[in-house]
């Protein structure tokens, strides 16, 4: 059975576009800046939502899409996205410590660490399995150990330190604020001393399908129940699916992702296209 979300849809005849957020291995091209320059890394999910977003949705991708839809006052963007399948959705400063450029870069250091932890042997694959689940959630028996080398050849792929700072600000704030630049710069950028909050309740026009799990430690169920489901307009929630025994990585790499997530999403889109 095909285990790739993209190929499940492509094999069914759908056009598929894959996006890479800024800072990842394939998201480092710029018309005037180079990744070696600090200015290149002056972005967070604010800029991803404002300038970069495409119809993709897993983990941080859901936060970016929710934010972009919340900023869509005239509904022009929502008209382009008929249905949005949000997998492991996320709703709700250590700048000097992390530096000012990229965080978890795709370079020789992370490659060496990944190779050391995630080797080719069965024992090494199991060790890698355990290390990854420390941040994603408890082991679910969905991990395909034979694909470990493929997964770790591209991950981690990197992001900006500013993006990590923005995430920390959001955690401390308890909601979804724009990036906090400090009072002086906030006044210049936003016209007020504090960053504005994004109102997910303002989202309209796009049907949202939520796929989440109690075992996901990053797309936390408390965040889903106490924030997303309360903030989103019930009229836009087309589906609210609580999957059993999915950790954060299983939505992309789990053996059960195709039958429990990808194929149901494919059926919804196919029925929609056929007018059923």
Model regions and ranges:
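Conserved alpha/beta-hydrolase "acid-adjacent" motif
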Residues: 217-223
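Short, surface-exposed "cap/lid" segments of acyl-processing enzymes
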Residues: 1-33
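Catalytic cores of eukaryotic secretory-pathway lumenal/extracellular enzymes that build
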Residues: 27-47, 65-68, 244
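Alpha/beta-hydrolase fold nucleophile elbow
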Residues: 40-64, 84
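Catalytic active-site module of serine/aspartate enzymes centered on a nucleophile-bearing elbow/loop
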Residues: 236-276
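Alpha/beta-hydrolase-fold enzymes
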Residues: 63-190
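The feature captures the conserved acid-bearing segment of alpha/beta-hydrolase catalytic domains
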Residues: 192-205
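Short beta-strand/loop motif that positions the catalytic acidic residue
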Residues: 203-204, 209-212, 216
